[in-house]
Amino acid sequence: MHTLIERLEKVTNSKELEEARLNALGKKGVFADKFNQLKNLNGEEKNAFAKEIHHYKQAFEKAFEWKKKAILELELEERLKKEKIDVSLFNAIKTSSSHPLNYTKNKIIEFFTPLGYKLEIGSLVEDDFHNFSALNLPPYHPARDMQDTFYFKDHKLLRTHTSPVQIHTMQEQTPPIKMICLGETFRRDYDLTHTPMFHQIEGLVVDQKGNIRFTHLKGVIEDFLHYFFGGVQLRWRSSFFPFTEPSAEVDISCVFCKQEGCRVCSHTGWLEVLGCGMVNNAVFEAIGYENVSGFAFGMGIERLAMLTCQINDLRSFFETDLRVLESF
C-alpha cells in the first residue's frame, strides 16, 4: 500500500489524479480488495489487519487532498497564463474608409467645383410650389402620379427630388448661375432598387439667352461620365421631363458585362445613369426670368455607387452590415 502514495506523488494533472483515486478508493480499488480479505481472518489477526488498512487509507486520503489542492492551483496558474491579455501588446488600430455614398458624393463634387459650379444645400421640407408647380408640374398634372410623396399639413412635404434647390437658387440669384445641389430625397418606395430615402445630385447652368446651348450640356455630361467611369461608351436617348425641353437620358456601356449582355443590364449592354435637358421656358416663367436659357441634369448617387461598387441591392448602403461596407 506504500506504492499507492508513491504513485500519488508522481501525479501531474487532474486526469492522473482521478485515476489514482479510483485505483485506491474505487469499488474495485486496492482498499476495497483489502477490506474483502478481512472475512477470511479471525480474532486478533483480523483486528490488527483492519487497523492497518484504516491507517493507510487515512494516510492516502490525506495525501490525496493535499495533492488535489496542489494540482488545481497548478492548473489554474497555467490556464491564467494562457488567457492573460497583455495590455502592453501593440494592437493596430483599424482605420475607417469612406462610406460608398460619401465617396461617390465627394468624387462628383471634385469634378464640378473646379469648373465653377457652386454647391448649394436646400431644405428637406418643401412646399408644393417649389417641389412641383414651379417645375412645370401644376396640380393634377399626370406626371405627379409618378411621385409617391410624404405629405405634411399646410401643403408641406418631404422633397421628392433636389430640383427645389434650383428654384430657390434662381429666386435668390440672378444669371449667370452655375450650381450643383445634392442631398436626401424621399419617396414611398422600398425594394431592391428603391428606398424611402435616397440621394440625388443635380446641376443647373443659366445665362443670357443664346449663351447656353445643348452642345454645352453634352460636353459637360460626357466629360463627367468619362471622368467617373473611365473608358465607357455613351448613348444619348431622347426622353421627356416636364421641367426640360428638349430632354434626354444618357446610358453607359455595361460595366459588368462589357456589352456582352447580363442580368444587370437586362441583356441590352447599356445602363441608364442620368437624365438631362434644356430648362423648359415654363420654369423660367414661374421664377420670373426673361431672355435666359440654361440646362439641367440630375442623377441618383446610389445608382452611381451601385455601378462602381457592383452592388445589386440598394438597401445594402443603409443596413450598416460591416461585412458589406468593409468590402469596399
Curated annotation (Swiss-Prot):
Keywords: Aminoacyl-tRNA synthetase, ATP-binding, Cytoplasm, Ligase, Magnesium, Metal-binding, Nucleotide-binding, Protein biosynthesis. Its main location: cytoplasm. Binds 2 magnesium ions per tetramer. It is found in: Cytoplasm. GO terms for biological process: phenylalanyl-tRNA aminoacylation. Mg(2+) binds at residue 245. It holds the Pfam family Phe_tRNA-synt_N. It comes from the Bacteria. Tetramer of two alpha and two beta subunits. Belongs to the class-II aminoacyl-tRNA synthetase family. Phe-tRNA synthetase alpha subunit type 1 subfamily. HAMAP family: Phe_tRNA_synth_alpha1 (MF_00281). PANTHER family: PHENYLALANINE--TRNA LIGASE, MITOCHONDRIAL, PHENYLALANYL-TRNA SYNTHETASE. This is Phenylalanine--tRNA ligase alpha subunit. The lineage of its organism: Bacteria, Pseudomonadati, Campylobacterota, Epsilonproteobacteria, Campylobacterales.
